[in-house]
Amino acid sequence: MKQICSIVLLGAAVVSLVSAAGSDSEISFEYHRYEELRKALVSVWLQCPTIARIYTIGESFEGRELLVLEMSDNPGTHEPGEPEFKYIANMHGNEAVGRELLIYLAQYLCNQYQQGNETIIDLIHSTRIHLMPSMNPDGFEKAASQPGEIKDWFVGRSNAQGVDLNRNFPDLDRIIYTNEREGGANNHLLQNMKKAVDENTKLAPETKAVIHWIMEIPFVLSANLHGGDVVANYPYDETRTGSTHEYSASPDDVIFKSLAKAFSIYNPVMSDPQRPPCRKHDDDSSFKDGITNGGAWYSVPGGMQDFNYLSSNCFEITLELSCDKFPNEDTLKTYWEQNRNSLVNYIEQVHRGVKGYVRDLQGNPIFNATISVEGIDHDITTAKDGDYWRLLRQGNYKVAASAPGYLTVIKKVAVPHSPATRVDFELESLMERKEEEREELMDWWKMMSETLNF
């Protein structure tokens, strides 16, 4: 990851933004082309420099930076015990509403933080938030360059190479479905990730950059913002049998449905049971309460949503936010008002389930320890500081921590709706246990020798 110095990023333009940031902090409800997007993010950073940071995870095929605005009380650092959250928008370049909403969200969080909104202050102090307004800046520029207000349904969807980025990720669904039948790992399905990604010539540069990002930061929760319908979509996206439409539950189907509803319930259009389909012949039969299982709607191989879940600890859903992919500019404020509360509430879901640390008996963190939940065939692993976050719905669970060379520890946990329950584990190494057993045996032998006068 490369942090962007604003002076290098925008040159002389920064000077004018410095003076404007204090007097005119509102971002107007309009579309932001690439240069305008950069300026908008820098404006947020200038207004809230203590809680904001701009960085890039790489470049698009045409050389545009894949920009991220981070918001945290300690930007630039993973704080042990603090969960990481991300929003990604504009993966399809012609699906533009999500791109603008993340710009508005950044400004909103900054404004509310400065105005003393306790909910937002607590959220930023307890969460490291990453906002990527555009994963496909090349596609957006192509879509936005079309004349007139009505944009073509497909122009700009793919990246500059013609690659559909939401069909371009390694297809881990096929691996997990094989493992379900024949036995095998249920998480982190790509070994030697960096090499496998770098050597895969079929992956677009935008896809590679996001994969490395997912592998570098221990994200817990994410959402991928799209357009073309109005629904919150959850894994699995790809069907088990190859059927076009088939409910494809993941092991975490219960919490995924709850996460999707956490977004849809605050969006009055998405949650409206009387909402007509976006188009006359659309099949919305799988939509209920504004949510749908991905496979039940239509099967998507190589999607980013399932890749997050199967390659890392990150749970991701896909948010379809508008019937029109590139609606008229005068509707953007309405879309913001419809989605503002949903966007904030969904971030708060990162503080559900159980969290804590896995350490050895000397207090040293155990990296890559496995956290398992009885009855859920999907494990997560600890980060470098031994910290972990396991999203769960309210209920009673048996949670286990294990690691090679250590004895497994199992704990019973009562999990409320929120906040997350703190559950720490101390694991005893097998070497220590063997040493204890050897010492106990020697003590017993000594006692027996003295008793029998050997």
Swiss-Prot record:
Belongs to the peptidase M14 family. It holds the Pfam family CarboxypepD_reg. It is a peripheral membrane protein. Zn(2+) binds at H92, E95, H226. Residues 30-350 form the Peptidase M14 domain. It catalyses: Release of C-terminal arginine or lysine residues from polypeptides. One of its GO terms (cellular component) is transport vesicle membrane. GO terms for molecular function: metallocarboxypeptidase activity; zinc ion binding. Disulfide bonds: none annotated. Its cofactor is Zn(2+). Expressed in brain, pituitary and islet organs, but not in other tissues which do not secrete peptide hormones. Binds 1 zinc ion per subunit. One of its GO terms (biological process) is peptide metabolic process. Its EC number is 3.4.17.10. CDD domains: M14_CPE, Peptidase_M14NE-CP-C_like. This is Carboxypeptidase E. Removes residual C-terminal Arg or Lys remaining after initial endoprotease cleavage during prohormone processing. It is found in: Cytoplasmic vesicle, Secretory vesicle membrane; Secreted. Glycans are attached at N117, N368. It comes from Lophius americanus. The active site is at E320 (proton donor/acceptor). The gene is cpe. Residues 1-20 form the signal peptide. Keywords: Carboxypeptidase, Cytoplasmic vesicle, Glycoprotein, Hydrolase, Membrane, Metal-binding, Metalloprotease, Protease, Secreted, Signal, Zinc.
